[in-house]
């Protein structure tokens, strides 16, 4: 399966359980892998035959800004469901990380994989 990869998309949103986390937006790093057939775009060289990186990125940034989840897991699942419903993709991997959130780490996070058919999205 072919992949479209978006790496280290910097999103800002309210996420977390404790008060300091919910008081102001935090920066999140989001990595997205979209599984889809890229052969039509490869043969035609037409942007309409593929998934727009820009549109995906803008959709994710807007969704993170407008939602307020307690867990990264819930945000990741929400983003996966949104992408699977809006774009012509077979599956998606979402990795979300909080930079410098836990002492002595550069970042912590979660990664999920969801399929359109198997997960009924």
Where are these regions (language model features)?
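N-terminal, polar/charged subdomain of small-to-medium soluble alpha/beta proteins
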Residues: 1-121
């Amino acid at each position: 399966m072919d992949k479209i990869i978006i790496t280290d998309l910097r999103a800002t949103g309210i996420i977390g359980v404790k008060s300091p986390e919910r008081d102001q937006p935090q920066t999140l790093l989001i990595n997205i892998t979209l599984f889809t057939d890229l052969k039509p775009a490869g043969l035609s060289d037409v942007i309409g035959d593929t998934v727009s990186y820009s549109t995906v990125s803008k959709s994710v940034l807007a969704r993170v800004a407008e939602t307020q989840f307690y867990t990264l897991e819930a945000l990741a699942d929400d983003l996966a469901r949104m992408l699977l419903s809006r774009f012509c993709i077979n599956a998606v991997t979402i990795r979300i990380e909080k930079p410098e959130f836990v002492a002595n780490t550069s970042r912590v996070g979660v990664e999920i994989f969801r399929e359109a058919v198997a997960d009924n999205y």
